[in-house]
Amino acid sequence: MRVKRGFKARRRRNKVLKLAKGFRGSRSKLYRTAADAVDKALGYAYRDRRAKKRDFRKLWIARINAASKMNNISYSKLIHGLKLAKVELDRKVLADLAVSDPAGFSQIALKAAAQL
């Protein structure tokens, strides 16, 4: 018996076109260009979910470095001093403290400097 696959093929194509919604021009209308655009977009999304983690870590380090320089200690010495003082604050929390509570960050920097 011959199988025509009409329903299955339509469903598969509609799934791709649904993912391409919001793309410009033929990339959201024509299956072939939409399929290419969706593949590319999913690849970028996969890549950038990983890059996001690196980007945020870079941002946190830049903020901590700026705040630690204001307290006359380098970033690397601050982190080393915190490890010696057994202060287990991660970079995300330290960066947030540096921005939202500079006085609190200064206390932490003093504690780190005392251990060096």
Swiss-Prot record:
<keyword id="KW-0694">RNA-binding</keyword>
<dbReference type="GO" id="GO:0005840">
    <property type="term" value="C:ribosome"/>
</dbReference>
<protein>
    <recommendedName>
        <fullName>Large ribosomal subunit protein bL20</fullName>
    </recommendedName>
</protein>
<dbReference type="GO" id="GO:1990904">
    <property type="term" value="C:ribonucleoprotein complex"/>
</dbReference>
<comment type="function">
    <text>Binds directly to 23S ribosomal RNA and is necessary for the in vitro assembly process of the 50S ribosomal subunit. It is not involved in the protein synthesizing functions of that subunit.</text>
</comment>
<dbReference type="Pfam" id="PF00453">
    <property type="entry name" value="Ribosomal_L20"/>
</dbReference>
<dbReference type="InterPro" id="IPR049946">
    <property type="entry name" value="RIBOSOMAL_L20_CS"/>
</dbReference>
<keyword id="KW-0687">Ribonucleoprotein</keyword>
<comment type="similarity">
    <text>Belongs to the bacterial ribosomal protein bL20 family.</text>
</comment>
<dbReference type="InterPro" id="IPR005813">
    <property type="entry name" value="Ribosomal_bL20"/>
</dbReference>
<keyword id="KW-0689">Ribosomal protein</keyword>
<dbReference type="GO" id="GO:0000027">
    <property type="term" value="P:ribosomal large subunit assembly"/>
</dbReference>
<dbReference type="GO" id="GO:0003735">
    <property type="term" value="F:structural constituent of ribosome"/>
</dbReference>
<keyword id="KW-0699">rRNA-binding</keyword>
<dbReference type="InterPro" id="IPR035566">
    <property type="entry name" value="Ribosomal_protein_bL20_C"/>
</dbReference>
<dbReference type="GO" id="GO:0019843">
    <property type="term" value="F:rRNA binding"/>
</dbReference>
<dbReference type="GO" id="GO:0006412">
    <property type="term" value="P:translation"/>
</dbReference>
